[in-house]
Amino acid sequence: MFSAIARKLFGSRNDRYLRSLQPLVDRINGLEAEYEALSDSELTAMTYAFKARLEKGETLDDLLPEAFAVVREGSKRVLGMRHYDVQLIGGIVLHQGKISEMKTGEGKTLVATLSLYLNALSGKGAHLVTVNDYLARRDAEWMGKLYQFLGLSVGVIIHGIEDQQRKAAYNADITYGTNNEFGFDYLRDNMKFSLEEMVQRPLNYAIVDEVDSILVDEARTPLIISGPTEDSTDKYYKVDRLIPQLEKERHYTLDEKQRSVTFTEEGNEQIEQLMRQAGLLRDGDLYDLHNIEMVHHVNQALKAHAMFEVDRDYIVKDGQVVIIDEFTGRMMPGRRYSDGLHQALEAKEQVVIQNESQTLASITFQNLFRLYNKLAGMTGTADTEAAEFQSIYNLEVVIIPTNRDMVRIDRDDMVFRTLEEKLKAVAEDIKVSYEKGQPVLVGTVSIEKSEMVSHFLKKLKIPHEILNAKHHEREAEIVAQAGRPRAVTIATNMAGRGTDIQLGGNLEMRLKKEIDPEASPAERTQQEIQIRTEYEQDKALVLASGGLHIIGTERHESRRIDNQLRGRAGRQGDPGSSGFYLSLQDDLMRIFGSERMDGMLKKLGLQDGEAIVHPWINKAVESAQKKVEGRNFDIRKNLLKFDDVMNEQRKVIYDQRKELMENEDIRDFIDEIREEVVHALVDSHLGEDVYPEEWDAKGFREAMLNQFNLDLNVESWKHEEGVTHLVAKERAMAAVKAYSEAREARLGPPLMRYLEKSIMLQVLDTLWKEHLLNMDHLKEGIHLRGYAQKDPLNEYKREAFQLFSMLLQRIREEAIEFLGKVEVQQPEEVAAYEAELAEARNQQMSLNHPESGSWGGEGEGPSSEGAPHLPFKRDGEKVGRNQACPCGSGKKYKQCCGKLS
């Protein structure tokens, strides 16, 4: 109550922050007349003047008013668009590393130019991250004219371009690209063998467009680069035939809230029996150690049948299972679910199974974007997730006021008892709008539901366009013309974000498409006049009919997705309306207490085809959505705690790789490792507290032969006077040193340096790949520790640290072993072998952005609180060798993760 009174007196935090920016906006406006008087060349010269001032010690904040004024003036001249005051505020928010929430149609693309220009002046690069290639290319071409006019270079990163083009794009002052491409380039760079091959510069500043989609919706989906494994595909078909013989509830239970499926006790017995009959089980039970691989196959097959539906989660196209993006409804060709789930779906649909893949490198979007020195975001819908952005990413959400007041009419939800009643009402609503010339956009949650709406419209003979994963080729065109009179567009999960729906249609697109390029100039002019006249008439008709009408056919789990759909109407003060039609058979209503509501509606005497409309219903639905959002937030928070463990290890390995590539001569490093390995072998076989007569001389001799290719007569040492543990160490080291020097003399120092570096990198990559597989296995079963009253997160941290310590030890041992045994005649052989390795790896690599696995079981077992999360702004300090290791082991850095360094 007191907080509400305080807000009335002093305004909200958002209001106070916006007021604090007004003096900056006034300073920018005050420069407008001065910059209008400049010639084009004088305006361009301002960029070079700003760069010179930065070099002399001024900061970007010092330059902000002048830089923004220059961009505004440049935009007026090149694009014919002037930044409004609210857009200047949006630009300041982005520069300060916050999230700018701007409603649809308020010009986010133009807003980004302000802070991108300012931050690019440092020469360290500025990235604009979008959700698809179309938007990246469109915005880079469109806004690129402005940057180039002001003397800055622009690059674009899209799928399928070569490394040379990528490097040039990253070296540009401003780079546009998709979240996936930025992530995969980061991973690929950390698999390269030389610094020259790497395409990215250090990550400096990024603006993430549709930041809610990338940092919230896709937070549980890691980017994975994988290669093929040797696993047989026959097992998937054989196991798949058994699953239809199981009964739901009796043999397995499906928890839709937790998105998990588990066998009952009877189900475990039944599947074991079926597998024995099919000859798939070796001796013993399904859960015996030697059958553990089959558990993986059975679990994925059950998940494929019970949790995944064709035309909702995936479609079968050209004999392949193609994932459908849950949030956009788009197809994701080339993307595959990991851990054998995609193979299980292929077996279920009886298409050719592609080999299961093994992870070579992976990263989540949270950890990718935390690598930037400064991060900002923009979206039309972030406020509902403001708490999550603040607590996980330390990103504050600032709501930017609209340039014109919103006049859209949002109706209360209408709730029907059955799906059929609801769809009939939707079709009737569309018919009313269609007859008065009003354009309608219908939002559905799946391909199946969009086909059902289409079926009802066909009965009423209403022409319409369908936009979903099956009809994605014309996406931009369909969305752009969805504002024409009588246009009816059915869209799954509002594909087409980023493309404005303009009332009357998109004039530019019509001119480009309908004017005949082969006609005479006079005819083309006549055609243009006719199209412009039609456009003005269409726009007037749509405005008179009430603007764009939005119909939601179901509430999404997230209020934000619903708000995105609503936000397509009422852009820039245009009229518009929206309403949601619900039924008790909808997923959200069914999962969250529809039985109780069904009984209540029957008591109220609700007849077939009647709907209940009341603000209380809206509140009940919103309450259900908040529950889901809260649960999903907890899952994402828990996932991030688990992923942070992996992230620390990844940073250590990637930093180590880069250090190896930066140094031409790693001889001292190799000598240090050799000494460590020799000392460890002596300590293990010729103990300090053991008499020489009791030494394991035979074991030590074999170990030295295996590790260094050296045959030492250790037996004779035992009988020599005065030979101690320390003397044995010195002798072994002297022998190793002499052998290494002899090899170097034979091969020559340049080749030896090349070999040391090359072998070190190859061993590190091979063992890191194995380590990722071990970490995947650890992750899969860790949540079960909760049933033994152990904290899964602490157990994961402890065992992950043990695995990582073993990895570092193995890297040292195997690198030294290879160096001792490898034989090379010519330097060209090494270079040829490396090139062959890189080529083979590139051909076999596949890029995946799957549904993430269950880090810690997605809430199963007790949850655990970890250390607070780091904000997205880094101080960039390097860990000192004598400081505590950041992985939390309690050891010094040089004795733990820094051991390789």
From Swiss-Prot:
Localisation per UniProt entry: Cell inner membrane; Cytoplasm
SMART domains: SecA_DEAD, SecA_PP_bind
Membrane topology: Peripheral membrane protein
InterPro entries found in the cross-reference section: Helicase_ATP-bd, Helicase_C-like, P-loop_NTPase, SEC_C_motif, SecA, SecA_CS, SecA_DEAD, SecA_motor_DEAD
Annotated spans, Disordered: 847-901
Binding residue positions for ATP: Q87, G105, E106, G107, K108, T109, D500
Keyword Metal-binding appears in the UniProt entry: yes
Biological process, per Gene Ontology: intracellular protein transmembrane transport; protein import; protein targeting; protein transport by the Sec complex
Required cofactor(s): Zn(2+)
Catalytic reactions on record: ATP + H2O + cellular proteinSide 1 = ADP + phosphate + cellular proteinSide 2
Free-text comment on the cofactor: May bind 1 zinc ion per subunit.
Keyword entries, A-Z: ATP-binding, Cell inner membrane, Cell membrane, Cytoplasm, Membrane, Metal-binding, Nucleotide-binding, Protein transport, Translocase, Translocation, Transport, Zinc
EC number: 7.4.2.8
Annotated GO CC locations: cell envelope Sec protein transport complex; cytosol; plasma membrane
Molecular-function annotations in GO: ATP binding; metal ion binding; protein-exporting ATPase activity
A Pfam family hit: SecA_PP_bind
Broad enzyme group: translocase
Family membership noted in the UniProt record: Belongs to the SecA family.
Subunit structure: Monomer and homodimer. Part of the essential Sec protein translocation apparatus which comprises SecA, SecYEG and auxiliary proteins SecDF-YajC and YidC.
Its biological purpose: Part of the Sec protein translocase complex. Interacts with the SecYEG preprotein conducting channel. Has a central role in coupling the hydrolysis of ATP to the transfer of proteins into and across the cell membrane, serving both as a receptor for the preprotein-SecB complex and as an ATP-driven molecular motor driving the stepwise translocation of polypeptide chains across the membrane.
Protein name: Protein translocase subunit SecA 1
Organism: Magnetococcus marinus (strain ATCC BAA-1437 / JCM 17883 / MC-1)
Name of the coding gene: secA1
